[in-house]
Structure formats: structure tokens, C-alpha cells
Amino acid sequence: MGIMESIDIGANALKTHGLRIDIHAKNIANIDTPNYVRRIPVLNATEDISFRVVLNQMKNDVYGTGTLPYTQGGVVFTGVVEDPTLGERIYRPGHPDADANGYIRSSNVNAMVDMADAIMAQRAYEANLALVYISKSMAAKAVEIGR
């Protein structure tokens, strides 16, 4: 894997985890909004490769530890799904969002779950930002050595 590939992977991860942070922030912001349905980010691997395919492609000589001739590229943000759990029914007959029986649904957002998910996404974002900075400094050193 080259330096530029690591920067590309880091940039892709920054975009992905930034979107995760945005989704969790919107969930937390709408925790008191009636009928709001929690959104869940969906991430998938960029390549779906089976173990056997990877094993067959490994370069494994007598003295080596085994390496792959390519990088898979990490994960990609593929969309958002709505949490199917229902919020609590609350009787509010005059509320504009009330149904025919006078009930509204509270949001199904759990603040602790979304805060924990947002913190994990933030830490992943920070780790990938460090990857980009380190790759950038490695590229600068390589150019400096080449002079």
C-alpha cells in the first residue's frame, strides 16, 4: 500500500465517520420532537471478499509472514435506516401531531445510546485524521529525501 492510498482510505473514513456524527447529532437534537424516528447509519465494506479468496491471494514464502498484494479500502457509508422500535404513546388531545384518539408518539431516541455511538464515531474520525496527517508527513519526508 502506498502513501497516497493510505491518504485516500483516511479521507474516505473521515467522510464516513463525519456523516455518522451528523446523524447521531440530529437524533440527539430531536429527542423531544414528537413522532421523530431515530436514524441509524449503515456502513458496508468497500469490497466483499471471502476468506478463501484472501487466503489464495496471499504471498507466503518460506521466510515471509504473508502479505496481500492490494488494500481493500475500508468502509463506505451506504445510507440511513429508521429504527423500527416505536416511541411511547402520550395522550395530548390538542397537539397538532395527535392522532384521531388524541395520542402522539414520543421519539424513540435513547440519548445514552446515541451519545455513545457519536463518541465512537468521533474517536474513529480522530484516528483517521491522525492517519491522514501521518501519511502526509511521510510523503513530505519522502520528497525531502528525494532531493
Give the ranges of each region predicted by the language model.
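Amphipathic alpha-helical polymerization modules
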Residues: 1-147
